[in-house]
C-alpha cells in the first residue's frame, strides 16, 4: 500500500465570527492498488488546527481562546499562574494576565512570513521553563526554516526576556540525522536545571551539556 499526507492552509469566508481565520489542515490517506488496477482507500484521517493570531477576540475572563486545537496543548505557567507560555501550531505565545498582554515569542511563520519556506513544519518547539517574571527558556528541534541556521538540522536553545520582549539564542547544536530521528532522540532525554542553568539534551545518540549562563556546550 501507499501512504500519502497532504498539508495545506485554508481560510474561512462569510459574515460569521470565524471569517478570515486561518486553519492548518493535515490529511492522511492509505491506498492500495489491487490486481485489477482498482485503487482502494484503506484509511483516511483529517485534522484541522486554527492558526492562533493573538488578537483581542482570543481573550476573555476565562483566559485564552485558542480555537480549534489539540487537547494536549503544551504550556507552562509561573507559580501564581499569572503568566502562561503555550505552543500552538508551531508558534510559541506568551500571555501576561496582569498586563493583559499577548506576545508572539517565536515562530518561523508569522504575518510577514507565510511562504512555503517558512511554513515547512519539520521542527518542534519545546518549553523548558518559565520563571516568576515570565522569562522563558525553550528549544527548537529539527529543520531551521530561516535565520542564521537556515537549512540546518539541529537543536537551538533560546531565552525570552519578558521585560525586554526579546529572544536571545543561547546555543545551537547541529545534528547529522534528520528531523524524525532527532525528535525521537530528544524525547529520550532532555533536562534543564534552573539553579545552574544547565541544559542536558540527547542528539544523534550523544548527550550534550549546554550551559546557558556562559553560552558554552560540551559532550
Q: How does the language model describe each region?
A:
Residues 105-115, 119, 170-173, 218-219:
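Trp- and S/T/G-rich repeat-edge/linker motifs of beta-rich repeat architectures
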Residues 1-19, 123-132, 136:
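Surface-exposed, charged secondary-structure patches
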Residues 17-73, 101-103, 162-178:
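Short beta-strand edge/turn micro-motifs at domain boundaries
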Residues 73-95, 126-150, 155-157, 188-203, ...:
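Short beta-strand elements that form the blades of beta-propeller/WD-repeat-like
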